[in-house]
């Protein structure tokens, strides 16, 4: 799955209410985000103590991880 496909399948989901940000870095407690930085894709998580954790990789890998996280947050 590519980023544009992720945007399409999540267009009817209130991502902000789930604590998900697509296309820009997360900056609130308990949020997760996915964005491109140069040639790299980044998944960034902010925990309850405002610590930031990043995973970097290929677009498909990062998008797959964030989509899985979105599905878990919906439950």
Language-model segments: residues:
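A short, charged, amphipathic alpha-helix used as a generic interaction element across diverse proteins
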Residues: 55-73
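Short intrinsically disordered terminal tails
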Residues: 1, 74-75
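Local beta-strand/beta-hairpin segments that build beta-sheet-rich folds
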Residues: 22, 50-54
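Short aromatic-glycine-(Arg/Gly/Cys) micro-motifs in beta-strand/loop hairpins
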Residues: 27-51
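Negatively charged, low-complexity tracts enriched in Asp/Glu with abundant Ser/Thr
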Residues: 1-27
